[in-house]
Amino acid sequence: MEVILIKPVRKLGKIGEIHKVADGFGRNYLLPQKLAIRATELNKELIVKQKHELEEKDKQIKSEITKINDLIKDQKLIFVRQTSDDGKLFGSVNNKEIAKKLSQAVSYPISHLNIILDTQIKSTGIYKVEVRLHAELSTEVTVIVARSESEIQDYLREQKTEKSTTEPLAESA
């Protein structure tokens, strides 16, 4: 199936590009999500006329997302959970929980689909999690999973000492 992208799609292309995709991918994902339209002759002509308008709209969205990314990148999300003696969680921390806590922290609705998490977090520690609000823009948040408030403070102190030891020392002349 040939489609014309009307929004940028990660790992596929930019606005206005024509791509040949699998029928299922086109029918079940690209078309229902309004990321693309079928590449008919009429649609090709329409997209040529509307491409500039679509790109301008995408630039506006990107600038808004950039502002939100600036808010997100400094966030530390803290989860206190029950664990076994070896630090394994009873349960896990998943992308839905991260999205909910991040939405509350920045006062902006963030879908769990925007949280890129390969596997659920199943043990205590500090994790970097990718947040992708736009196909071309992403940022990272710090997720801290601990069994108590005191353990969180230990992680934060540990992180500060790591930063101070990795920063280059000013040379005295």
UniProtKB/Swiss-Prot annotation:
GO molecular function annotations of the record: rRNA binding; structural constituent of ribosome
Keywords, alphabetical: Ribonucleoprotein, Ribosomal protein, RNA-binding, rRNA-binding
An individual GO BP term: translation
Recorded coiled-coil stretches: none
InterPro entries: Ribosomal_bL9, Ribosomal_bL9/RNase_H1_N, Ribosomal_bL9_bac/chp, Ribosomal_bL9_C, Ribosomal_bL9_C_sf, Ribosomal_bL9_N, Ribosomal_bL9_N_sf
PROSITE patterns associated with the record: RIBOSOMAL_L9
Entry keyword annotation includes Ribosomal protein: yes
PANTHER family listed in its UniProt record: 50S RIBOSOMAL PROTEIN L9
Similarity comment text for this entry: Belongs to the bacterial ribosomal protein bL9 family.
Purpose of the protein: Binds to the 23S rRNA.
Protein name per its UniProtKB record: Large ribosomal subunit protein bL9
